[in-house]
Amino acid sequence: MSAPGGPLARLEARLTREWQRRGALAWALTPFACVFGLCAALRRTAYAQGWKQPVDVGVPVVVVGNVTVGGTGKTPTVIALVDALRAAGFTPGVVSRGYGANVKAPTAVTPASRAGAAGDEPLLIARRTGAPVWVCPDRVAAAQALRAAHPDVDVIVSDDGLQHYRLARTVELVVFDHRLGGNGFLLPAGPLREPLSRHRDATLVNDPYSSALPPWPDTYALALTPGAAWHLDQPTLRRPLSQFANERVLAAAGIGAPERFFATLRAAGLAPATRALPDHYAFADNPFVDDAVDAILITEKDAVKLGASWRDARLWVVPVEAALDPRLIALVVEKLRGRSPA
């Protein structure tokens, strides 16, 4: 994992900036984007034409993913969707790749798991929802193992995996943030894994800067709202974000879109110093030792990676709740009750 401010982090930051415009670097990379797009199109066509067959795992599958690289708010969306499906009478389970973990075979994730063995996002989902969560690079194998261990599960939510065509799915939800499709180019010239025109059942847009939605069919606003911060060492100790307004605060985030976390805090009335860490940052040591601040605000995704050895009394965790449009929930429930995996 690259260090904060290291060469890899700087390269990632530059690409992220370049992907928002059609500058010289983006145009120079378009030949590689054409090759990437051709390979991706061949994979899609192989399944669309029946040359390869997706695997039906026996229950409906909802894939929550994106067509861009980087964080868009998928994890809080998965958590909210699991809660909504449970409220609608389903018994959901979750599968994920387990990015950042050394996982080769289907592995169960429990609230007591370690992030290094499960992945930070699956561990957060397990802790927040209490639903069965299994991880494996092969999501079909993860889903089959989950069903064998939990035969009462009647719907599976796939955290990411939109491009994992081998897993048959009933519903596809694509999540965007305010960057939408960036410059509209495929990787590596732009942020797109697939064209924006890719079919999906619904689109969710998480944009803290604007309430306007793009003119796409079946598009819904995704609102991410911060809750009261809880103390890392004493989780029952909570403070409204407004109480940090007159303190020296550092906001740090090792997520795909750290600026979105910082914007959330600013919208809550804070003016923190900020530090963007690499996505899935491992926290092998404390990067905040030399920071002269009263409080350090971090994300839940980062908090699950901090074990008992962390004793920095300044650390506070800011939970985020996703509010799903009731019309979106109704659409998903209708499709689950009316269709088989395909």
From Swiss-Prot:
Superkingdom of the source species: Bacteria
Which species is listed as the source?
A: Burkholderia cenocepacia (strain ATCC BAA-245 / DSM 16553 / LMG 16656 / NCTC 13227 / J2315 / CF5610)
Identify its protein family: Belongs to the LpxK family.
Give UniProt keywords alphabetically.
Answer: ATP-binding, Kinase, Lipid A biosynthesis, Lipid biosynthesis, Lipid metabolism, Nucleotide-binding, Transferase
Query: What does the UniProt function comment say about this protein?
Result: Transfers the gamma-phosphate of ATP to the 4'-position of a tetraacyldisaccharide 1-phosphate intermediate (termed DS-1-P) to form tetraacyldisaccharide 1,4'-bis-phosphate (lipid IVA).
Q: Which EC class, in a word?
A: transferase
Is Transferase among the key words of this record? yes
Q: What is this protein called?
A: Tetraacyldisaccharide 4'-kinase
